[in-house]
């Protein structure tokens, strides 16, 4: 049995395949945000337990998928990637206890963009003029989307969300290296899960779970995190760091639209205009061939 990403790769043209993998991954990221909001903001589970269940369930799901599709030796352990995955999950969960959703999105994705753009620039990646214009439109649309409900975050919450964004940016940059995305992601989850469990033990006095909270955490881990990250790793092999950074700006408007559909939040013209700016800007970035400093690629 072949892994989903490998089977998909055999029957679809490369450009279409990358676009499809990226789009599905962004939907998974947005769904993950919705699940996290449902679980944490409603007090259905404590942040440490949510993070632990998310990583453990993701590790179990990915172990099953990796074992079913194993065709090559396991890749070497990538402890830095596993550590970044743990830092992202832990900081993200705890930040949303004190930071509003709109403010958190701006801090998180701002940190991701700066981290991945810095990595891309250091590696010699550059955009053509239309690519920079598209990125500016997408970033401006994101600020426009979240600014109406922007609330001053607590220093602790802002620091945690910034750390989550930096960790996710580093994790994504490292994700461009693996040849086997399923095995690499499974290994990262497997090594990050004990770190999350250790944190839960250290914070045992805050332990609080409900059946609904457990279900939401498992869905977040096994589906929108575990399998979603496999698709993201598969797409990352064909994206520059700067393109990968830009495309993630599409997650906030997708999540906002999901909140309208599934959380009964009211649609607004601001949401429609911001979403158009973000998605149009991302499309411009993806349509522009990235180049290396001093020459094209």
Where are these regions (language model features)?
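Glycine-/small-residue-enriched transmembrane alpha-helix faces in small-molecule transporters
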Residues: 1-52, 83, 90-91, 140, ...
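Hydrophobic alpha-helical transmembrane segments of multi-pass integral membrane proteins
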Residues: 17-20, 48-64, 131-137, 156, ...
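Specific transmembrane alpha-helical segments of multi-pass solute transporters/efflux pumps
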Residues: 28, 69-109, 116-117, 137-144, ...
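Hydrophobic/small/kink-forming positions within alpha-helical transmembrane segments
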Residues: 30, 34, 56, 63, ...
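Membrane-interface helix termini and inter-helical loops of multi-pass transporters
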Residues: 34-46, 97, 143-156, 200-218, ...
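Hydrophobic/aromatic residues within transmembrane alpha-helices
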Residues: 39, 50, 54, 95, ...
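Specific alpha-helical transmembrane segments that line the substrate/conduction pathway
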Residues: 49-60, 85, 93-126, 164, ...
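Hydrophobic transmembrane alpha-helices of multi-pass small-molecule transport proteins
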Residues: 62, 85, 127-147, 164, ...
